[in-house]
Amino acid sequence: MTESTKIKYCRADSGSGSKPLSAETKTRLMADGKKIDEEKKDGTAVRRVLFWFAVLVIRFALLMAMHYYHDVTSSRCDGARAGGARTGRSALSRVRGRRRGGGTPDTRPYCDSGTACLDFRKGGCNHGDACEFAHGVFDNSSADLA
């Protein structure tokens, strides 16, 4: 019996005898890479690979863009910038202020600096919210990092 007659008929899933296979099923059942050669000639395999590559590249680019948008740091924190434009967390807090009450937006200056304020660490910073350095909880022990 030849290869083509072996795969010409196959038992159906319902169990009611044999029925002819479709051309797509025949190509799935073929061995020794014949299906791969057919797809290479047709170009469907290449298109499929390019499609998934494009999907992954776009997904990665969007995720990285979102990461960098939320990780914006500024060296100066002077409240309103040129034309009232803000970046990073300042812009996000302003939007949140609009959403909360619908009234006036949150216009407080918010500093995104990652550098710790030395005066705040010592006990008091005279600049308050207008300070260009970060205020918050900082780990003073560098032994944990090693």
Curated annotation (Swiss-Prot):
Q: Where is this region: Disordered?
A: 80-106
Renumbered zinc finger spans (C3H1-type): 111-138
What Pfam families does the entry give? zf-CCCH
The UniProt keywords, alphabetically, are: DNA-binding, Metal-binding, Zinc, Zinc-finger
Q: In terms of domain of life, where is this protein from? A: Eukaryota
InterPro entries, alphabetized:
Znf_CCCH
Q: What is this protein called?
A: Putative zinc finger CCCH domain-containing protein 29
Organism equals Oryza sativa subsp. japonica (Rice)
